């Protein structure tokens, strides 16, 4: 989802607001909020709503969000979705990527992230030019703790329990756009754009 969000962001010229990236930066910087979030992230659990929503609201006031934005990683619960509505944060469309759990596990196992700048790669689908080295800054590519198989399985259980109910929440509001897996990032992204323009 993050890779598709980045591509859409470039094509639509609007920022992707990734809660994961914002939280990881806070953890790396050792901010009080980052330290609070770290224990949840390391366990593959969801970070409390008040932490997530505070970060999101602050970020959406930036000038680059004036013409729109893509939220990646929020909302993850009905409570977060309702809180976003109460904060006056308007969500026009919700993209629902229809991907099997086994495919997600395989994709996450191949993900690598730059330890310096946070750029994301995949050993098969989006490799760096030099194995293990970031194309952007030359930093080392690493496997994040939350991409390890046992953590991915825990995250999927959490998704099915807490996030999957959002499908009906947004479908009832006429905002849900279901996107079947198209087999490649490029094909999926083209399909998403076509559906958003419909």
Where are these regions (language model features)?
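Glycine-rich phosphate-binding loop of ATP-dependent small-molecule kinases
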Residues: 1-198
């Amino acid at each position: 989802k993050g890779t598709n969000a980045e591509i859409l962001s470039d094509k639509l010229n609007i920022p992707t607001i990734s809660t994961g990236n914002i939280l990881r930066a806070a953890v790396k910087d050792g901010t009080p909020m980052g330290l609070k979030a770290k224990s949840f992230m390391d366990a593959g659990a969801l970070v409390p709503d008040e932490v997530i929503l505070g970060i999101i609201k602050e970020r959406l006031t930036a000038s680059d969000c004036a013409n729109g934005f893509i939220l990646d990683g929020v909302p993850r619960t009905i409570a977060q979705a309702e809180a976003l509505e109460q904060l006056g944060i308007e969500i026009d469309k919700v993209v629902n990527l229809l991907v099997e759990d086994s495919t997600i596990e395989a994709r996450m196992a191949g993900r690598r992230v730059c330890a310096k700048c946070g750029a994301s790669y995949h050993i098969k689908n989006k490799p760096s030019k030099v194995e293990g080295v970031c194309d952007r800054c030359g930093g080392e590519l690493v496997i994040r703790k939350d991409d390890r198989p046992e953590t991915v399985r825990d995250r999927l259980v959490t998704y099915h329990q807490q996030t999957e109910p959002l499908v009906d929440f947004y479908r009832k509001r006429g905002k849900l756009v279901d996107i079947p897996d198209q087999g490649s990032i490029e094909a999926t992204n083209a399909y998403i754009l076509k559906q958003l323009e419909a």
